Amino acid sequence: TLCSESSPLMSTHSWRDALKIYSSPASIALLLLGFAAGLPYMLVFSTLSVWLRESGVDLKTIAFASLIGLTYAFKWVWSPLLDQWRLPILGRLGRRRSWLVLSQSLVAIGLAGMALCDPQESLSVLISLAVLVAFASATQDVAVDAYRLEIAENESQAALAATYMAGYRIAALFAIAGALYFADWFGA
């Protein structure tokens, strides 16, 4: 039967084993990397559209800007390059870490630049920065997946994927709720 002791569906791990896996340094790192990947995703997809609408940008332009999200759908196109190219300066950190550092740096620069833009005055700059953020974030997503596969044994992969997704979802909530909070705070 499905619930017999010999069933492959029955777990042989205790709560202590689960706690050990989910509190490991690798799990905590993946939780933080998930947060770092989820935040720009939601900012580019949801929050940007709301911001543009609140700024009076026409709906056709907002619809066009939503195409930025396609970078996440097509990340498979450039993902093999992350395996092939070794970054010149950051390469000493290792292949995965160097791509993580580069992509996170580009995300931070892009988000900071977006925060300084006024959609009414510099819409093209804002959209260009959003494309940069989306591309760097999608690249970061690829690098994190490869990093996760390299740092852990097979039996830990499910826990690491779960902590990554938990961080991703927490970031999504933070991006949406945080945007609403700051909009209220600044009276936008």
Residue map of PLM features:
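Hydrophobic core of transmembrane alpha-helices in multi-pass small-molecule transporters
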Residues: 35, 110-113, 121-140
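Loop-to-transmembrane helix entry/capping segments in MFS-fold secondary transporters
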Residues: 59, 154-163
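Cytoplasmic membrane-interface "Motif A"-like loop-to-helix N-cap segments
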Residues: 84-104
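Helix-loop boundary and gating motifs at the non-cytosolic
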Residues: 13-72
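Transmembrane alpha-helix termini and helix-breaking/packing motifs in multi-pass membrane transporters
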Residues: 83-84, 115, 174-188
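C-terminal ends and interior cores of transmembrane alpha-helices
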Residues: 100-120
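Intracellular juxtamembrane helix-capping segments at the cytosolic ends
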Residues: 139-152
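Glycine-rich segments within core transmembrane alpha-helices of 12-TM secondary carriers
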Residues: 75, 159-179
